[in-house]
């Protein structure tokens, strides 16, 4: 069980650094029938994606949407975005093209990481489009070289703009800070103790805050492995 004493700060940077340090070679993320990604490997993939985003012009405070069914690279993409100071905009995979366009316009988001299945729903107004499967750039131009400069996240920095499912009308955007989300993951351990030998099957969309915090972050925080269904 991890507490704020281990993390020192309620930020995704603190969580990521702690998990890699404590559980480096342990399996972290995987498809049910695939080869797991270790915590060390996840950390390297996060750095590689951050470099790609930086070369594409991403700066702290920029918004990047994640539009995909739940897959191992969803969490990689999220950590890469928020630990470089940018803001993640998770979109539900069942959003229509009109709903996607409305959310992107409302949040002023022009960059998106998306699964191949959902690419046809992404509007032409998007300037940067990245395939979540291998983080290849499908649309966009690199404007600089090198690595992103060091960035220190603060607890009250906005980590996500979450859009509701829109059951009472148009989806509404809600800003959530690093502290909001990391604190929820820590608090969730009072209901279910997790350790590095646990394994979880995630079936709900990671764009739901519940699944993201309890079905992903709480396990990542404690060195467990989260599995996802393919297809």
Label the predicted regions:
Residues 24-27, 145-163, 170, 193-199:
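Conserved pre-ATP/AMP-binding loop-to-beta segment of ANL
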Residues 8, 17, 25-71, 75-79, ...:
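Conserved AMP-binding/adenylate-forming core of the ANL superfamily
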Residues 85:
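Structured binding elements
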Residues 117-155:
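ANL superfamily adenylate-forming
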Residues 182-199, 206-231:
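Conserved AMP-binding/adenylation subdomain of ANL enzymes
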Residues 38-40, 159-185:
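Conserved AMP-binding A3 loop
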Residues 68-79, 94-98, 204-221:
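Conserved coil-to-alpha-helix start sites within the AMP-binding
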Residues 93-122, 184-201:
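Conserved ATP-dependent adenylate/AMP-binding module captured primarily in the ANL superfamily
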